Amino acid sequence: MAKRGYEVVTTVRSEDKAAKIREAHPGAKLTVALVPDISRPDAFDEVVRAHGQGLEYVQHTASPFHYGWTDAKTELLDPALEGTRSVLRAVQRHAPSVRRVVVTSSFAAILSAAGIADPTKTFSEADWNPLTYEDGLRSGPDNKADAYRASKTVAERAAWDFVKDGGASFELATICPPMVFGPVAHHLPSLAAINTSNARFVDLVQGKWAAAIPPSGVFLWVDVRDVALAHANAMERPAAAGKRFFVTAGYYSNREIAAAVRKHFPELKDKLPDESVPGGDYPEGGVYKYDNSRATEVLGIDWIPLEKSAVDTVKSLRALGA
């Protein structure tokens, strides 16, 4: 957004992150504020009150995505749900000039367990994950993904309910990406801090796929640069108001990712799986379908292809020491 000429106020949870972001964007019209705990009901009141005069747009992108949790309520569900509610309440109370809020949701709020097992199913913005907050609380070690999926679903539903029931003075749009690949931020402190989606690339270049390629996951992906573009255009374009956007470039498999990296990084040959290594392919019965036409047309996205995204991701990881 700074590149588009906006004056940006962003929030982080620690002063260490704030310093890294300031250092990474010298000369930008940028203010970095601290919000240590987004699950507090008044988490964003102070920063919105301080900067709300003249504020036009808000993007809420913060929500935990990982499967290493021990308490789904405090680590996933409440930060996602209360974080979303607290942003919207703060805007409503303290920033009457805000025209639109864009919330980062997820394909997790669209998919269903039955749907992803059905190759005849076509997912679009019309679909909602049936998981509830209570389902998320019941998640255990054998189904950790359900807690994350529930957290994104209830958070996005809360955003739409707020606009519908609370007489909001602003418009809403939501962005629903699946797995997000692409170059990592150069202010990332170390490979240990890599996001969940890109962790597969770290494992790949460190030789962890050499003997067997792991299962791919949900088979739909998008490049982080297209996700950023989707947020910017959903914020600015009149036709985006009041809409969900299923933001995906299409299919991927871990086998395709390995092949792209093997093609472009011959110097990593000894760490990469060769063509005979098993695993990481599409299911024999096929994969569910998707409809990304709304995002393509309304947001005007020319999707970055998988091979380019994979190459750019590995380049950025190698710069961090991978």
Could you describe each region identified by the protein language model?
Residues 13-82, 92:
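NAD(P)H-binding glycine-rich loop region in Rossmannoid oxidoreductase-like domains
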Residues 60, 70-71, 75, 79-145:
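Conserved Rossmann-fold NAD(P)-dependent oxidoreductase catalytic core, especially the SDR/UDP-sugar
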Residues 131-172:
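Active-site Tyr-X1-5-Lys
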Residues 168-169, 182-198, 233-245:
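Glycine/proline-rich active-site loop of Rossmann-fold NAD(P)-dependent oxidoreductases
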Residues 200-245:
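Alpha-helical substrate-binding/gating segment
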Residues 214-217, 245-252, 283, 299:
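Glycine-rich Rossmann NAD(P)(H)-binding loop
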Residues 228-280, 312-314, 322:
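Mid/C-terminal beta-alpha module of Rossmann-like enzyme folds, strongest
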